[in-house]
């Protein structure tokens, strides 16, 4: 990666960290009502400084301590909230793997959610996630175990395919959604599930690996 990439990444994170420091100071110094207003100001400050760096950015909000990698390959619609401590990465490793992330309108990305793309991740409208959710279209290393003698950081990045999440989906805490998965509209995924296969619309899924346990329509 070029020196320009590292400079831009440093500047992006510096802006976000400044907003984070402002938010933390408000919690220490002021009472609850003032803190809420200060949090809103912090989000507005971070969003205002960051939004021009994205491929497309609607009328949405970024909270403090959010880490973006290559936001020029990330699109976010209107009315979406990226909550504290999220990591959203669009990796560019080669011509074969050039990550892109598209997040729709009116989504709420819960705290500590990690979205990482080396291929493409598409999220529809009105997504709600809990905390500590992982959405990934890639992994380190081959599934046949032929590269286990290499350090994980040096193994080839592999993607089984794009991740596509439909509209009005609810993803509970600590769910992992793996590469090559398509999730339909109106799906509910129970906490701690690992999604490795497609899920049809209007169902409740749970487990490791996640299975449909109820259909709503």
Segments from the language model and where they lie:
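Domain-scale signature associated with acetyltransferase and cell-envelope carbohydrate enzymes
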Residues: 1-137, 162-168, 175, 185, ...
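Short, flexible, mixed-charge acidic loops at enzyme active sites
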Residues: 141-151
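A short acidic, glycine-rich active-site loop
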Residues: 151-163
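A short, flexible loop at the N-terminus of ABC-type nucleotide-binding domains that lies
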Residues: 179-180
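A generic "structured core" feature
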Residues: 184, 188-190, 194
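Active-site nucleotide-sugar/metal-binding loop of Leloir-type enzymes
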Residues: 197
């Amino acid at each position: 990666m070029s020196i320009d990439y590292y400079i831009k990444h440093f500047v992006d994170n510096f802006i976000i960290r400044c907003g984070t420091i402002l938010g933390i100071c408000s919690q220490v110094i002021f009472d609850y009502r003032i803190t809420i207003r200060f949090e809103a100001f912090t989000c507005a400050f971070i969003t205002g400084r960051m939004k021009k760096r994205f491929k497309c950015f609607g009328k949405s909000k970024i909270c403090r301590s959010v880490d973006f990698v290559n936001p020029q390959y990330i699109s976010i619609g209107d009315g979406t909230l990226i909550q504290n401590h999220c990591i959203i990465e669009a990796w560019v490793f080669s011509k074969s793997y050039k990550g892109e992330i598209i997040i729709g309108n009116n989504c709420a990305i819960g705290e500590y959610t990690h979205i990482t793309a080396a291929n493409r991740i598409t999220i529809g409208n009105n997504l709600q996630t809990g905390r500590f959710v992982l959405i990934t279209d890639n992994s380190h290393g081959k599934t046949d175990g032929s590269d286990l003698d290499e350090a994980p950081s040096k193994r080839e990045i592999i993607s089984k395919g794009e991740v596509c999440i439909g509209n009005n989906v609810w993803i509970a805490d600590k769910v992992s959604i793996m590469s090559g998965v398509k999730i339909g509209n109106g799906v509910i995924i129970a906490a701690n599930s690992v999604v490795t296969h497609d899920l049809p619309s209007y169902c409740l899924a749970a487990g490791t690996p996640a299975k449909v346990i109820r259909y709503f329509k």
